[in-house]
């Protein structure tokens, strides 16, 4: 059984037991969170596709940790001017473990 749900403006395909990194959520570590914006639920032969959401669909997850991703380096360069500018960015994330999928 798998589901597709939306969180932080992105869609994630998950199964029970999977660990997923989402955009940062303001939830304490160890707490349980429910995602109700479920777009699709597939259970063996049957597939429930929402229009746009599946009625009664929920994905239940447990918050494992919060952190920051690896640094992405941005370089801006002006040709012929001997000028360059370097910047870095580290995005915050929340890591969750999917415990249940309800349709």
From Swiss-Prot:
Family stated for the protein in its record: Belongs to the bacterial ribosomal protein bL21 family.
Lineage top rank: taxon: Bacteria
PROSITE patterns cross-referenced by the UniProt entry: RIBOSOMAL_L21
GO molecular function: rRNA binding; structural constituent of ribosome
Disulfide bridges in this chain: none
Gene Ontology terms: cellular component: cytoplasm; ribonucleoprotein complex; ribosome
Keyword S-adenosyl-L-methionine applies: no
Organism: Shewanella pealeana (strain ATCC 700345 / ANG-SQ1)
Quaternary organization: Part of the 50S ribosomal subunit. Contacts protein L20.
Upper lineage: Bacteria, Pseudomonadati, Pseudomonadota, Gammaproteobacteria, Alteromonadales
Record keyword Ribonucleoprotein present: yes
Protein's name in the database: Large ribosomal subunit protein bL21
Key words, A-Z: Ribonucleoprotein, Ribosomal protein, RNA-binding, rRNA-binding
GO BP terms: translation
InterPro entries referenced in this protein's UniProt entry, alphabetically: bL21-like, bL21-like_sf, Ribosomal_bL21, Ribosomal_bL21_CS
Main function: This protein binds to 23S rRNA in the presence of protein L20.
